[in-house]
Amino acid sequence: MESEDLSGRELTIDSIMNKVRDIKNKFKNEDLTDELSLNKISADTTDNSGTVNQIMMMANSPEDWLSLLLKLEKNSVPLSDALLNKLIGRYSQAIEALPPDKYGQNESFARIQVRFAELKAIQEPDDARDYFQMARANCKKFAFVHISFAQFELSQGNVKKSKQLLQEAVERGAVPLEMLEIALRNLNLQKKQLLSEEEKKTLSASMVLTAQESFSSSLGHLQNRNNSCDSRGQTTKARFLYGENMPPQDAEIGYRNSLKQTNKTKQSCPFGRVPVNLLNSPDCDVKTDDSVVPCFIKRQTSRSECRDLVVAGSKPSGNDSCELRNLKSVQNINCKEPLVSDEKSSELIITDSVTLKNKTESSLRAKLEETKEYQEPEVPESNQKQWQSKRKSACINENPVASSNQWQIPELARKVNIEKHTTFEQPVFSVSKQSPPMSASKWFDPKSICKTPSSNTLDDYMSCFRTPVVKNDFPPACQLSTPYGQPACFQQQQQQIPATPLQNLQVLASSSANECISVKGRIYSILKQIGSGGSSKVFQVLNEKKQIYAIKFVNLEEADNQTLDSYRNEIAYLNKLQQHSDKIIRLYDYEITDQYIYMVMECGNIDLNSWLKKKKSIDPWERKSYWKNMLEAVHTIHQHGIVHSDLKPANFLIVDGMLKLIDFGIANQMQPDTTSIVKDSQVGTVNYMPPEAIKDMSSSRENGKSKSKISPKSDVWSLGCILYYMTYGKTPFQHIINQISKLHAIIDPNHEIEFPDIPEKDLQDVLKCCLKRDPKQRISIPELLAHPYVQIQTHPGNQMAKGTTEEMKYVLGQLVGLNSPNSILKAAKTLYEHYSGGESHNSSSSKTFGKKREKK
C-alpha cells in the first residue's frame, strides 16, 4: 500500500516537473524571440524612420529614444561627417518629440540632451554652448548634466565659467553631490578631466553600495540561493546613472524597449524576476541582469509614470521563480510557499501582475501607516514639501480605482504622504549624504526659480530682451539690494532720463518679493534675469515711471585687468557712438565702483542669433533691411576709428524692428595714423573669423605672443558670413567639423566657397564681394552701402508715386467745386467710369471731362 502511494506521488511529482520545464522552455523561447526582434529593429542604421515612427506612435518615452540613439551611435564608429550629421539629426528629432516640461525630471531625457550637446560640440563648438545651457536649464537636478557643461567650458579654456557652473550645481542641489565635489576638486587641481576613469569607477561602486544598503534596510533581506554578484553589471548600472557614454547593450539594462511589450497580448514574468508593472503598460515586465542590483526608481513628469528597476536574486544554473499568492504584509515581501525543487534550483511560481481592489488598497494604506514609524527613515519636512511641489501637477492620480490594477511594489525608503499622493515617488539616486536644498538667490523672485525653464538659450549676452506680460502696478515699496554689501544711494536727486519705446507697463511681481537696484540714486525694480556670461548678468528692470530698461551688472571682485579694460572700453564706446547713430544700443546711465559696474541700457526684444535660430525662412525685404542696419552700425564705428573684430549675430539686438550693435568689450580703437591694428590675442569666432586674422596669428610674433592683424575689412568678412547665414541657413564653413581643417579651409585660396543660385543675383554678388580672402580685393563698407542690393529701386517707384499724386490732385480738383450731394455723386461716378476704362489723366481727358460736367 505504501509502495503504491509512493509511486503515485512520484508520478504526480514527475508530471508537475514536466509542466514546469515546459513553462521554462516557453519563456526562454519568448525572451529569445523578443530580443532578436528588438535587435533587428534597432540594428538598422541605414533607415530608422520605421523605428522612429513606432516610438513616436507608441510610448514616445525617453528610454526608447535613448536605446535607439545609443545603438545608432555604436554602429556609427568610426564617426564620419555624414554619420555625425545623421546622428545629430536623430538626436534633434528626439528632443523635439520629448517636451522638456514633461520629461525634465527623466534621466534618459537628460542623457539625450547632454549627448546632443556633445555631438554639436564636435561639429560646431560655437553653437554647442547653447545646447549645453538648454540641457542644464531643462534637467538641472542631474549632476552629470552640469559636469558635462563644465567640462565643455574647461575644454574651451573658460576655467572661471566651469567653476561657476559646478558651484551653481551644488547650490541647486544636483545629485549626486559627491560627483560635484570631486569635479570641483579636480578643477582646483587644474586637471584637464573633471572626472577620471578611476573616479568614475569609485563613484559607481559607492553609489551601488549605498543603494544596496538602502534597499536591504527598507525592503528587508532578499533571500537568494546564490548571492554572487556580477561587478560588471553593477558598474554598468551606476555608470548609466551619471551619464557616461556606454555601449547600447549595457544601456538597455533596465530600459526594456516598450515596442517589445506591445506585441504581446499577455506576458508572464520570467523565472527568477520580480514583477513590476509600469503605469503605462500593466502587462509589461522588467528584464534585468543576472546580478544583484539595487532598485532605482526614476521620477518622470509624464502622467504619473514611474519606471522601476527591481532586481531579484541571481540564478546559478536554472531559472528561479516565485508566486505572490496573497499580499498579507508590506513589511516582508518574500515567498512563503515553497514548491518542489529541481535538481539544480528550487522553483517558485510568480504571477505576472498584482491586482489590488479597493479593499486591498485600503488595507495596504493601513499597513503602511503602521509600519512607517519604525521602517522608514525620517525625511525633513522642507524636502518633502519641495518634492511634492515639483510633482504636484503631474503625479497625483485622480482615479485610484481605475489605477488599482497598476500598483507597483514601492521602495520603503522615504516617507510618503498617502493622503496627498497615490503614486509612490522615489529619488533617482539613493545617497546617504543629504544634498543641500536649493537656496534662492537674493537677486531672484523665489517664484521665478520654480518656473519651468524655457528651451531657449539663456547664456547669450543681451539674450531675448522680451517684454513681460504685466498686470499689477509697480509696488509702492520694495526691498532694495545692492550686491556685495554696497549701500544703495537714496538721497540723490533723481533726474529725468529718456524713455524707451516700452512705456507705461505694469509689473507682474509681488510687492514683497520683488527686489530693486539703485544706480546713482535711481530705483529700478528687477523683473527677471535675461542674460549672463562670465562675471556679468543682465536684468530686465522697471523704473518708477513704468519704463522698461536693461541693467547690466558686472562683478569686479575677481576681474583681471583685461576684463576691467574691456568694460571701461565698452562704456566709453557706447557714450561716444550713440550720439552719431541710432543703430548703436543706447546707454542711459552707469555707475562704476571698485566692486561692481551698473549699466542702464536700452531693452530690446531678441538678439539676431536667437531670431535666426527660430526663423525657418527669412523674408527678402526683412533680410535686406537688417543688412542695411548692420552696415550703418559698422560704418559708424569705422568712422570713429574702431574695429569691432568679433562680429557675429549675437552682437546685434532687434529693437522695434531695427538691428542695433551691442557688446564692444573686445573692440579696439585704431590710432589715427594707422590703417590696421594688432591685437594681443585672437578672440574672434571661428565661423566668422577673417583669413588675415588666422594667417597673422602664426606669422607675426612679438615678445613670445601671437599677434592678430585686423582692419575694417575684417569686419566686412564677418558681416559677409552673417549675411551668408541669413541667406543659406548656415555659415560658409559650418559643414567642416574639425576645427583645424576649418581654419585651413578659411585661409586656403584653393578651397572654393559655395554660392548656390538664388533669385536675388545682387545679393549673391554682395556675398562674393564680402567673402574674398584678399583684404585688398574685398569690398568696403561705403561700397556696400552704395551697392544696388541695399538700394530700393527708386526710379520706377518715384515715377509711379508722382503719377499717383497727380491723379489724386486732379480728382480732388474736380470735386472741390461741387456743393450738392447729387453733383458730387455724379462727378464721382464719371471719374470712376473714366479710370475704369484704363485711361490715365492727361490734358485731353481733362478737357473732355470738363465738357461732360458742363453739359450735365
From Swiss-Prot:
The superkingdom listed in its UniProt entry is Eukaryota
Kindly state which reaction or reactions the protein catalyses: L-seryl-[protein] + ATP = O-phospho-L-seryl-[protein] + ADP + H(+); L-threonyl-[protein] + ATP = O-phospho-L-threonyl-[protein] + ADP + H(+); L-tyrosyl-[protein] + ATP = O-phospho-L-tyrosyl-[protein] + ADP + H(+)
The residue ranges of the Protein kinase domain are: 524-790
Q: Which PANTHER family match?
A: DUAL SPECIFICITY PROTEIN KINASE TTK, MIXED LINEAGE PROTEIN KINASE
Indicate the quaternary assembly. Interacts with TPR; the interactions occurs in a microtubule-independent manner. Interacts with MAD1L1 and MAD2L1.
GO MF, one term, reads:
protein serine kinase activity
What EC numbers are recorded for this enzyme?
2.7.12.1
UniProt family annotation:
Belongs to the protein kinase superfamily. Ser/Thr protein kinase family.
Phosphothreonine modification, residue list: T33, T360
Residues annotated as carrying Phosphoserine in the record are: S7, S37, S80, S281, S317, S321, S363, S393, S435, S454, S820
Q: What PROSITE patterns does the record point to?
A: PROTEIN_KINASE_ATP, PROTEIN_KINASE_DOM, PROTEIN_KINASE_ST
Which sites are catalytic? D646
The UniProt annotation places ATP binding at: I530, G531, S532, G533, G534, S535, S536, K537, V538, K552
List the protein's name: Dual specificity protein kinase TTK
What Gene Ontology cellular-component terms does the record carry?
A: kinetochore; nucleus
* UniProt keyword ATP-binding, yes or no: yes
Q: What class of enzyme is it?
A: transferase
What SMART domains has UniProt attached to this entry? Answer: S_TKc
Which Pfam families does the UniProt record give?
Answer: Pkinase
